A protein has these predicted regions:
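Short pre-active-site segment immediately N-terminal to redox-active cysteine/selenocysteine motifs
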Residues: 18-19, 25-29, 72
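Non-catalytic, surface beta->alpha helical segment in thiol-disulfide oxidoreductase systems
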Residues: 78-105
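Conserved helix-turn-beta segment immediately C-terminal to the redox Cys motif
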Residues: 18-20, 37-56
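Conserved Rossmann-like nucleotide-binding pocket used by diverse enzymes
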Residues: 6, 26, 52-54
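Structural microenvironment flanking redox-active thiols in thiol-disulfide oxidoreductases
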Residues: 58-66
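A short beta-strand-turn-helix
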Residues: 3-21
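Conserved redox-active cysteine motifs that mediate thiol-disulfide chemistry
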Residues: 25-39
Length: 105
């Protein structure tokens, strides 16, 4: 299950998470984001209980995008213990995302 992040739940869901967190920064008008969306959903199912999968709509949550230095979308950031440890900018294959996650768990 993917969690929609906003300024109210970001700290608890990402920064204070006991497990690694994958955060997908996206926008509805972004073509590559639409291509990545089913991959992110698949990752949420595949890693359920091991990795928390979250999404941030940059149009609705500009402050979170700025806080994470998002300049291009889609951008996926992996967090461990509240710290960003890996950033993947642009559309990637599921293998790329799985490799990045597997390095952390």
């Amino acid at each position: 299950m993917e969690i929609e992040l906003n300024s109210a739940n970001y700290e608890g869901e990402v920064l204070k998470s006991d497990i690694p967190v994958l955060v997908d920064f996206w926008a509805s008008w972004c073509g590559p984001c639409k291509m990545v969306a089913p991959i992110i959903s698949q990752l949420a199912e595949e890693y359920e209980g091991k990795v928390k999968v979250c999404k941030v709509n940059v149009d609705n949550e500009g402050a979170l995008a700025a806080q994470n230095a998002i300049v291009s979308i889609p951008t996926v950031i992996l967090f461990v213990n509240g710290k960003a440890v890996k950033k993947l900018v642009g559309a990637h294959s599921i293998d790329d995302y799985e490799d990045a996650i597997d390095e952390l768990i």
